[in-house]
Amino acid sequence: TRSSRAGLQFPVGRVHRLLRK
């Protein structure tokens, strides 16, 4: 998925998820 690919390219998805929480 696009999210998985973006997370691998840069720790943005993981950080975003933590911030959203």
Swiss-Prot record:
GO MF annotations, alphabetized: lipid binding; protein heterodimerization activity
Gene Ontology BP annotations: defense response to bacterium; defense response to fungus; innate immune response; killing of cells of another organism
Gene3D superfamilies (UniProt xref): Histone, subunit A
Tissues showing expression: Expressed by the skin glands.
Keyword terms: Amphibian defense peptide, Antibiotic, Antimicrobial, Fungicide, Hydroxylation, Immunity, Innate immunity, Lipid-binding, Secreted
Keyword Secreted listed: yes
Modification N6-(2-hydroxyisobutyryl)lysine, positions: K21
Domain of life of the organism encoding this protein: Eukaryota
PROSITE patterns reported in the protein's UniProt record: HISTONE_H2A
GO cellular component: extracellular region
The keyword Nuclease belongs to this UniProt entry's keyword annotation: no
Annotated localization: Secreted
Annotated function: Antimicrobial peptide with potent activity against some Gram-positive and Gram-negative bacteria. Does not permeabilize membrane, but internalizes into bacterial cells and alter specific gene expression involved in bacterial resistance mechanisms. Has the ability to agglutinate E.coli, and lipid vesicles. Shows a weak hemolytic activity, and is not cytotoxic to monocytes.
Similarity-based family: Belongs to the histone H2A family.
Domain notes: Adopts a distorted helix spanning from residues Gly-7 to Pro-11 and a regular alpha-helix from Val-12 to Arg-20 in membrane mimetic environment, and a random structure in water.
Protein name: Buforin-2
